């Protein structure tokens, strides 16, 4: 009882201080908003999309070429750039957006997949009485609620458990989390609560039990980041923005303002990356929303511009779904080096991350083995010793570059800005940098406000609060049932389509091929263990997918869930895209090779394959080597030193096991390091050595060969005197 009174007293004191800060900050926030909107001139805002469907990429390119001048040209198709385009076009501004790669090809698709207010920022705000940190949290919590509302199919609340291993931490964390709920106010998703040790283990049975005191559960949001980014860009296109991916800005256009005599940025020279065609896109205002590449565009404007971006790499890994409960995440608030690690269920898998390492800016960040192992070690610290955390259980890994920035207008140019920065150069180039995924909308609003004021544009107020993104307006939690009933899709596929496309899922279902089976009637899967279907490839092209990498990483999320499954699906994906886009054989092969290179370097396949090669010398006991050699030779009956698909088929037929040829090719390809269609004895021994060390989670070939050996050993010859054939 005394303990509860002490805790309540702490809350009252902390809450009183926070209420004072809250009141002052809200008044200041209101004044800032009024000042921002004072200069906005009346204009006709667009209340409904002008296009039922986004125009084709070809149509968008024609609009870019044939429009004499846009009001706004946004460079960058990530979350912030797409948000700027949507904010501008819905204010009635003539808007264009160009992206040198694909929408969400950079940092925006490589996040932790959380929509959060920032618990740690609130802790700093209270401990240091930092009003800026508090405002960041307040703004993020408002934006979190808005994002969950406007894209309900792509986002949902997620309970996150904070395990406590020291008794004094329980009231400390509880007060902090309750203040997080308090700051959220009406935007609080669900109230946080405390769990006893036994209840915590019920929810998270694989948790480390020793010294566990209890746990605190709070709520944040989770989303499908690349699909969310795409939904923002597609919504902007439907409202009339000319958006084009694979359009690179080669240089900025400039002209002298006749009224002031100053040189002003007046557009950009753009190059179609797919065809090489170049043309000018003119605009009254150009916005630089290029994330980690902020400085490269600023230097196009002014070659002497000081760098403001300090890039930091954040690595994440994906592990099998059994590593976490299906509907609850875990937060490690203090890792061995002071970082925060999240451990979250996502798309029926488990995401663990992230790291925070200074890096160079690159279009192709590669996850390092050091960072992967750091995350694995932190996971081991929090999971029960009964759970063996193996390197081979890493199904995919990626690195995203955080565009941390310094404010060029600040007196202390060395300090990292914890919020976003809107900078206006002497020539009128507007740069938006920093911030985080959750606050993309408010960042876009601030940026367009600055553009309207600086360039005297005629625009209405921002309308993006509550504006549904594509697929969200008519979505409901039971929409998938109609897909099952009306089209004959299997339930898992229907749920996936509803959660990916929202009310547009019916259009995908209409494209689905007949399976030829009694059930499901339609919906041929790309790979058996994931609910992605072939119709999504056709529909993905309508969503501006231009390459196989677009399809495996951002239209579907296969590359982020399992690199091997993505590689297995690639040939069929390329075949389907080739039909729609009229690719010849050379183009198809080029797409295959590019996509495999992407999986190998950027999605962790290289690190995964190194567990079998560079770092996996054969370290088996002599008895194990003999045992595996005997198993191998049961397949290699001709003593060739290698086995082929024919050898495997022969053994399987002898034990009455049927398996189609495509599956067998996939099974052998997993182990065929030389990619010569043969699995050599040395490759097989390397595989078994890696499995024993836990560097590889398992192999279908290894399991198949073990099962075949056991079946062959059981077939002992029947003695003549027991076969009814003796005399």
UniProtKB/Swiss-Prot annotation:
GTP-binding among keywords: no
Xref: Gene3D superfamilies: Alpha-glycerophosphate oxidase, cap domain, D-Amino Acid Oxidase, subunit A, domain 2, EF-hand, FAD/NAD(P)-binding domain
Record PTM Phosphotyrosine, positions in chain: 601
Listed GO CC annotations: mitochondrial inner membrane; mitochondrion
UniProt transit peptide range: 1-42
Classification via Pfam families: DAO, DAO_C, EF-hand_7
Entry binding sites for Ca(2+): 672, 674, 676, 678, 683
Name the record gives this protein: Glycerol-3-phosphate dehydrogenase, mitochondrial
UniProt source species: Homo sapiens
């Amino acid at each position: 009882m005394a303990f509860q009174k002490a805790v309540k007293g702490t809350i009252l004191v902390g809450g009183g201080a926070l209420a004072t800060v809250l009141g002052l900050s809200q008044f200041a926030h209101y004044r800032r908003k009024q000042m921002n909107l004072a200069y906005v001139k009346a204009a006709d805002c667009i209340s409904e999309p002008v296009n039922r469907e986004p125009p084709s990429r070809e149509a968008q390119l024609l609009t870019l070429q044939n429009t004499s001048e846009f009001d706004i040209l946004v460079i960058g198709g990530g979350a912030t750039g797409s948000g700027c385009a949507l904010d501008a076009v819905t204010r009635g501004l003539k808007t264009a957006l160009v992206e040198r790669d694909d929408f969400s090809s950079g940092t925006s698709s490589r996040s932790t997949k959380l929509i959060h207010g920032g618990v740690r920022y609130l802790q700093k705000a209270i401990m240091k009485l930092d009003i800026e940190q508090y405002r960041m949290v307040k703004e993020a919590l408002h934006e979190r609620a808005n994002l969950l509302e406007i894209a309900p199919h792509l986002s949902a609340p997620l309970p996150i458990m904070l395990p406590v291993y020291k008794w004094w931490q329980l009231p400390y964390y509880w007060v902090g989390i309750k203040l997080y709920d308090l700051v959220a106010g009406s935007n609080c998703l669900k109230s946080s609560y405390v769990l006893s040790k036994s209840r915590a283990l019920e929810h998270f049975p694989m948790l480390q039990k020793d010294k566990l005191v209890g746990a605190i559960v709070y709520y944040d949001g989770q989303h499908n980041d690349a699909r969310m980014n795409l939904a923002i860009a597609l919504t902007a296109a439907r409202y009339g923005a000319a958006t084009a991916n694979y359009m690179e800005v080669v240089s900025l256009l400039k002209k002298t303002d006749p009224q002031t005599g100053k040189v002003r940025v007046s557009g950009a020279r753009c190059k179609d990356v797919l065809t090489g065609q170049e043309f000018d896109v003119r605009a009254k205002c150009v916005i630089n929303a290029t994330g980690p590449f902020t400085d490269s565009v600023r230097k196009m404007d002014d070659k002497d511009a000081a760098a403001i971006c300090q890039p930091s790499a954040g690595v994440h890994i994906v592990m099998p779904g059994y590593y976490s409960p299906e509907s609850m995440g875990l937060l490690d608030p203090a890792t061995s080096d002071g970082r925060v690690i999240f451990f979250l269920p996502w798309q029926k898998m488990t995401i663990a991350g992230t790291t925070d390492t200074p890096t160079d800016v690159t279009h192709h960040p590669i996850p390092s083995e050091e960072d992967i192992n750091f995350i694995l070690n932190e996971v081991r610290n929090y999971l029960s010793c009964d759970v063996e955390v193996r390197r081979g259980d890493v199904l995919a890994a990626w690195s995203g570059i955080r565009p941390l920035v310094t404010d060029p207008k600040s007196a202390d140019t060395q300090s990292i800005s914890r919020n976003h920065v809107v900078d206006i150069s002497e020539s009128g180039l507007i740069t938006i940098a920093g911030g985080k995924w959750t606050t993309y909308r408010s960042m876009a609003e601030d940026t367009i406000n600055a553009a309207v004021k600086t360039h005297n544009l005629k625009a209405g107020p921002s309308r993006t609060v509550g504006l549904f993104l594509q697929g969200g307006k008519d979505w409901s939690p039971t929409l998938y049932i109609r897909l099952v009933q009306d089209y004959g899709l299997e339930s898992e596929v229907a749920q996936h389509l509803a959660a990916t496309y929202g009310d547009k899922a019916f259009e995908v279902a209409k494209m689905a091929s007949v399976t030829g089976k009694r059930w499901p009637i339609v919906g041929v899967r790309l790979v058996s263990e994931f609910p992605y279907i072939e119709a999504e490839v056709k529909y993905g092209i309508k969503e501006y997918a231009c390459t196989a990498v677009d399809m495996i990483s951002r239209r579907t999320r296969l590359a982020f869930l399992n690199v091997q499954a993505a590689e297995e699906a690639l040939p069929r994906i390329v075949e389907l895209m080739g039909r729609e886009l009229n690719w010849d054989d050379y183009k198809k092969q080029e797409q295959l090779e590019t996509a495999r290179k992407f999986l190998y370097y950027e999605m962790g396949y290289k690190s995964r394959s190194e567990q079998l090669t560079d770092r996996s010398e054969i370290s088996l006991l002599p008895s194990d080597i003999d045992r595996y050699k005997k198993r191998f030779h049961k397949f290699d009956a001709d003593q060739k030193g290698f086995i082929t698909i024919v050898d495997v088929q022969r053994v399987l037929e002898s034990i009455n096991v049927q398996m189609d040829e495509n599956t067998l090719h996939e099974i052998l390809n997993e182990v065929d390091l030389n990619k010569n269609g043969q699995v050599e004895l040395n490759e097989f021994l390397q595989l078994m050595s890696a499995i024993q060390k836990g560097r590889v989670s398992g192999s279908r070939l290894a399991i198949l060969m073990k099962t075949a050996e056991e079946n062959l050993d059981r077939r002992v010859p029947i003695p003549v005197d027991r076969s009814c054939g003796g005399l």
